[in-house]
Amino acid sequence: MLSLKKYFTEGLIQFTILLSLIGVRVDVDTYLNSQLPPLREIILGQSSAYTQTQFHNLRNTLDGYGIHPKSVDLDYYFTARRLLNQVRALDRFQVPTTEVSAWLVHRDPDGSVSGTQPSAGIALENSGGLQDGTGPDGAVRESGAEQGFGEELEDLGAVAAPVNGDLTKEDIDLIDILWRQDIDLGAGREIFDYSHRQKESEVDKELSDGRERGDGWRSAGGQVTNRNLLVDGETGESFPAQVPGVEDQTALSLEECLRLLEATFPFGENSEFPAADVSTLSEAVPSESRPAGIQSSLLSPLLPETESPFDLEQQWQDLMSIMEMQAMEVNNTTAETLYNGTSGDLLTSNYNLAPNTPINQNVSLHQASLGSCSQDFSLFSSEIESPSMGGSSALLQLAPDNSTGLNTTFSSTNFSGIFFPPQLNSTVNETAGPELPDPLGGLLDEAMLDEISLMDLAIEEGFNPVQASQLEEEFDSDSGLSLDSGHSPASLSSSEASSSSSSSSSSSSSSSSSSSSFSEEGAVGYSSDSENVDFEEAEGAVGYQPEYSKFCRMSYQDPSQLHYLPYLEHVGHNHTYNMAPGTLDPEEPKLPSVGKKSSKEKPSEFLDKQMSRDEHRARAMKIPFTNDKIINLPVEEFNELLSKYQLSEAQLSLIRDIRRRGKNKMAAQNCRKRKLDTILNLERDVEDLQRDKSKLLREKVEFLKSIRQMKQKVQNLYQEVFGRLRDENGQPYSPNQYALQYASDGSVILIPRTLADQQARRQERKQKDRRK
């Protein structure tokens, strides 16, 4: 008794209070059912005549109920029982409700339960909501009292000794049997517990008070807790029966709420928020005729059961992570207002809606990013707003975005207006106070909106946001192309974007030509800007002198010079020193236009840039003909050209040097060309040989497969023929002694095995001799 009393006072009460403080529902009677010995043993003491071994009890030990309340086995039992109850409740439709459990420390002696029959009558009179079952219940209790166990049924949850303690063994056994049958039938201890019925009577009393002010919805909600007690014909026990009207009322309420939600927020197919019909919602859920607690109890338990098409939990986690990164501080009065009961009622009365409304649960970042949300998201009418709030906007009214840097995807949408409306950010009181700064206001400035635009472009077009800064820096250049643009996974799209940007910002034709050339060549390791600019500078399209390339000479950047090798467009050779722009002769004549170029003049055009030093010296020596003629003319024509002019020795020496160097460079180019041709031819030959080898290997595999199949067929035929042969006595020949020999003329001969082996060895020797 000492340990049991200590368990009641220290263990169970303290543990239950702690669980109730953190919001966990605790039913002490269910634990008392299985964890403790039956109450008759507590009251009367244990007796070997009627004590049964509870082999289902997890806390049983060899010496009885001797486990200390602080034992570690209790945690395992509590967890196992809780999980088992959850598993058993999977097939039932449960509507979550909010229950407040009050623990009575000091009990009034007048309200205590005694074992007499008048106390049962008091319990029935005080239990509002059980009036319909008073007659049958009273009959059952009277019959139980006549049998001598009515008091046990009424005072099953009490720990006081009964007045009439003269129970016999048969009565106690009958009580035990009936109690176990109640447990098997699903009737818990709360049916006969006076404290439980007292709680229900208090709830019914509150509901009846609200029914006096309410309407049809409120009256229907009050009938949910009414119970009818039916009598089981087999056991004689009374248990609550489900009233058909209650189930119909619950089902109709749920269907009506779902229908209202579907009509108000059709998220299934529409991509934008339509205008909500608030009048329907206000008529279905009147607020003036019922307190705020009843609104939350009717709407809040039913609305979470509807499945939203969006992952609301993930969206809210993303939003909270953004808030934590920006280190925002929201006023404590806002949190107190949202989570305090009194201020929550004020908020509910102001907006005619429960705090956890479907609007707050169905707002997602995806829907917030739509373009026309601000026009269609009129979820609340003017009558919902409180007059005390002044000129503030509705609960979820979207404000137009004041930023101009956002693209069309995020236009006319204010995220802060969606998730943190002004009504929630301000302190909720009867006077209109100043609004708090928007928690997400710092996130949607000009710089962040530009970054969002770039991120949207990166998602849709494969644009690399890292190149944005490079493009901005290179808008003033002649081409607008970055040197490392080929490293992007979407180099083609980035080049197109840069070409369009540069061509729109530049007035010269060099940007368009370089961009088109870059788009045709693809992702390369160098920029061909200087080459194309030099072409058009010679044509007169650009009025400034371009710089030379710092990476490779221009004469080796033209793909037309190596048209036979497609991938050598990106390979450049640098065999000479770079020349500064100032070393060029300012009086150099302009080359003819692109349309008048011939195939013979193209090589000389590139060689002029390579031989700028020789050109300079030739102009200084006043040589009457160009370097193109000096290098490209045949020997006879070259000699005739020299004979036409009277040239000095210095001029002749310079002409010969120019011709020799030009011929050497052309020969070197031809040599490199021949080497590359040879390498390419060898590579092609190797590839052809590899293809032939693979083809021969496949044919060999096919031949081996055919030979294997033929051998298998010959072996099967050999066995079939050998099996049909018979000797003089009609007996088959033994395959160990005889074998079939194939003659050259196609006949088959039966010979002994030894002779066949000798012939086979001879054949092998002949084959070896032939190989040698």
UniProtKB/Swiss-Prot annotation:
One of its GO terms (cellular component) is nucleus. Residues 656-675 are annotated as: Basic motif. Pfam families: bZIP_Maf (PF03131). Residues 198-223, 472-531, 581-613 are annotated as: Disordered. Keywords: Activator, Cholesterol metabolism, DNA-binding, Endoplasmic reticulum, Glycoprotein, Lipid metabolism, Lipid-binding, Membrane, Nucleus, Repressor, Signal-anchor, Steroid metabolism, Sterol metabolism, Transcription, Transcription regulation, Transmembrane, Transmembrane helix. Glycans are attached at residues 332, 340, 362, 402, 407, 414, 425, 429, 574. GO terms for molecular function: DNA-binding transcription factor activity, RNA polymerase II-specific; lipid binding; RNA polymerase II cis-regulatory region sequence-specific DNA binding. The record marks 103-104 as: Cleavage. It comes from the Eukaryota. SMART domains: BRLZ (SM00338). A motif (Nuclear localization signal) lies at residues 761-768. InterPro entries: bZIP, bZIP_Maf, NFE2-like, TF_DNA-bd_sf. One of its GO terms (biological process) is cholesterol metabolic process. Residues 478-519 have a biased composition (Low complexity). The chain crosses the membrane at residues 7-24. Residues 682-696 are annotated as: Leucine-zipper. The cholesterol recognition/amino acid consensus (CRAC) region directly binds cholesterol, as well as campesterol and 27-hydroxycholesterol. Has much lower affinity for epicholesterol. This is Endoplasmic reticulum membrane sensor NFE2L1. It comes from Gallus gallus.
